[in-house]
Amino acid sequence: MKALDQLSFDNRFARLGDAFSTQVLPEPIAEPRLVVASESAMALLDLDPAHAELPVFAELFSGHKLWEEADPRAMVYSGHQFGSYNPRLGDGRGLLLAEVLNDAGEHWDLHLKGAGQTPYSRMGDGRAVLRSSIREFLASEALHALGIPTSRALCVIGSSTPVWRETRESAAMLTRLAQSHVRFGHFEYFYYTKQPEQQRVLIDHVLEQHYPECRDAEQPYLAMFRTIVERNAELIARWQAYGFCHGVMNTDNMSILGITFDFGPYAFLDDFDANFICNHSDDRGRYSYANQVPIAHWNLSALAQALTTVIEVEPLKETLGLFLPLYQAHYLDLMRRRLGLTTAEEDDMALVERLLQCMQRGGVDYSLFFRKLGEQPAADALKVVRDDFIDLAAFDAWGADYLARCDREPGNAEGRRERMHAVNPLYVLRNYLAQKAIEAAEAGDYSEVRRLHQVLSHPFEEQPGMQAYAERPPEWGKHLEISCSS
């Protein structure tokens, strides 16, 4: 493992030039202190986790110190926000500090969120508050533990710097890790500003650095776009299967790598509700749970439009047409596994849809249902979960078909239990748990944030003394309103 001064750097994106980003120094926050750090994220940089407790760690990730090799940059991009094009967005409060080259030959962006004003701040103060920084940290690491592709969170650094939102809050900085911070909106920016040369430079950069397997294809750009479509189909399938709602699926929040990116007013489903809206600013439900699939397709079509400078329209349309069948295949595979099924039958999707309809009518806790379904042999488990449903006739009919389906599966009850426990989490990041940790942190107690992070890092394993994190949320905890304010 390495010390902080032993990291290797290779700032590839910064070398693209000033057309793609602006050099900006971070604005330090006062009295920086470590709130929480992720050991597994530190391992991506080969960093010794013990170094998180050193004063220099907080100084480096709060803007007080910089590595000599750092080249902090605010990236420029645009994007469609709630369906309307915004021609100039960019990093309004974040900086790409540097790219770390680890011992495995992987490049990891160090991105400092809440680093102060940039040319793209648009009247904002460039700061992030403690609560939003904690929420992004917890979500990044929780999704990673669930096997959902995501950016990672290295740490949150708190401070005594005041900032004003609805009330006075304290500023914080979150260090995000990703192998690229290029978004769909980067390509839209150069397309709509009619800068084809710069756009081709960006496309070649992404192809060379992030999709090298596509370079030797007959049409490398089209092969890259197809891979982006494939990755997004799998990503959204995982969101839907695990009940994750992003909340702000603007094209500037879509990663070119097909990972979960830019966490705001997200939520995991508590009671199953296909029409659930986690962002209280989303009056029309554009980014509701049910709409995430068509919105992902819409966003990919926006990316495709931006790529028409280098790819013919018809091949782009054909490739876009792959998204929905790919999504459906991934989603059905994940739901089979959540139900303990290892083989495929023609009526499996109908079985899943009928279950979700029963859940919708009964207000059934989405995550706990699957966990309880795997606790015992199928017939016994159905008796346990039956009490959670309202339409008992419909559930009993579903249960009979599910039992018959299980009877056609190979293996025994114990094997089924192990399979289901390996894919059905006991612990999920519920908004009320995050809120309790945030309130403690705002009062100066970081122990709950760290404890919750540790619990969520092992979501499938029962952890002694942590039963409170596996409970159904109280009524007040189901209706927390989360906005984009951060």
From Swiss-Prot:
From which domain of life does this come? Bacteria
Could you tell me what reaction this enzyme catalyses?
A: L-seryl-[protein] + ATP = 3-O-(5'-adenylyl)-L-seryl-[protein] + diphosphate; L-threonyl-[protein] + ATP = 3-O-(5'-adenylyl)-L-threonyl-[protein] + diphosphate; L-tyrosyl-[protein] + ATP = O-(5'-adenylyl)-L-tyrosyl-[protein] + diphosphate; L-histidyl-[protein] + UTP = N(tele)-(5'-uridylyl)-L-histidyl-[protein] + diphosphate
- Residues holding ATP: 90, 92-93, 113, 125-126, 176, 183, 262
Give the Gene Ontology MF terms in alphabetical order. AMPylase activity; ATP binding; magnesium ion binding
Q: Which Pfam families match?
A: SelO
Q: Cofactors per UniProt?
A: Mg(2+); Mn(2+)
Residues holding Mg(2+) = 253, 262
Give the protein's recorded name. Answer: Protein nucleotidyltransferase YdiU
Write down the species: Pseudomonas putida (strain GB-1)
The gene name on file is ydiU
